[in-house]
Amino acid sequence: MTQPLPDHGQPWNEVRARMTDMAAGDVKWRDGRAAVYVFNAGEDIDRVQKEAYALFASENGLGPAAFPSLARMEREVVGFGLGLLHAPEGAAGAMTSGGTDSILMAVKAARDFARKERGLTGRLNLVLPRSAHPAFDKACMVMEIEIRRTPLKGFLADPEAMEAAVDEATIMIVGSAPCFPFGLIDPIGALGALAERRGLWLHVDACVGGYIAPFVRMNGGDVPPFDFAVPGVSSMSADLHKYGYCAKGASTVFFRTEALRSHMPFTVSDWPAGKMTTPTLAGTRPGGAIAAAWAVMNHLGVDGYRRKHGMVTAAREQIEAGVRARGFEVIGAPQLGIVAFTHPEVDGLAILGQLYQRGWVTSAVTEPRGL
């Protein structure tokens, strides 16, 4: 459907008023009515995000030589993440536009590693638990890789089922920390042992948990090993714009070694303008997202994140207690910010519909039906 561009420009105050009117029907996330899509750390962090983003809104991360400030900020943000996730010396990574982007790049690196270093040809496959994010399906669809989802055991990845699905053409196995449907951390230690035993690339999808789990652990929470502290982990994804409280779109993808990361970039020289290399899929990379991430992380620091995530833990525990008191059953033993629950007599999807009608936005699970 076409839309005619206005013949004449309009004053900004009028355009802004129209935008505000358009948003009148949006979920009131600032009032706490959205459990997904927005990770609200409060007005102070919102202000830091916006001001930092605006300072570099026109700059482009595609040109590190032109904008060394952005290159430095990205390097430091990546370093912060590597440090929090127990990466060894020599580990590497990059910022991306979001979790799907990070996962796509990790799969691309694993595929190219399998072809160049392991000599694999023909149809390749990726093995993951049923609860893993559909971004892996998207990546495999784009790269024509067979996706093999395996049954869960107690709502967690089942290492035995995953090993049974592995063969010589497997380029990657996946664990989540936590999985999005249930908020549960897969047995990464066991998956790491499987990866080492079979010579497999293990990717840990910590898009949800990467920037909350380290601080929950610092606060005394019982968080199992899930990151590069597990020897078999080759790569990780972790979203800055979730519990890192950075502006959208900002995520990170990490690799245990520079040699593994080297399979991620794109380099093309067969055209009339010389060699072009991009570290990730994107060409233009918004400088505002890089700058806002750097600003928020420096503004909060470890103590700030511990405070914010202490509040998340308290809220999750309060929700757990509240739903249990009303006859719901909490799925598993959530340790971070997501809690899923079902009721033996009430359809969770029906509740979801009623919540939406009342201006509350959350997500559902379908196996079993719940919230």
Language model segments and positions:
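Active-site nucleophile and cofactor-binding loops and adjacent substrate-binding regions
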Residues: 69-70, 93-100, 128-129, 365-366
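Glycine- and acidic
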Residues: 58-65, 88-94, 123, 147-150, ...
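Short glycine/serine- and small hydrophobic-enriched flexible loop segments
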Residues: 83, 108-112, 294-299
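Active-site C-terminal subdomain of aminotransferase-like
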Residues: 218-335, 342-344
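Conserved PLP-binding catalytic core of the aspartate aminotransferase-like
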Residues: 327-359, 365
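Conserved PLP-enzyme active-site core in the AAT-like
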Residues: 97-268, 272-275
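A short glycine/serine-rich beta->alpha loop
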Residues: 38-41, 61-65, 89-97, 238-241, ...
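N-terminal entrance/gating region of PLP-dependent enzymes' catalytic architecture
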Residues: 1-90
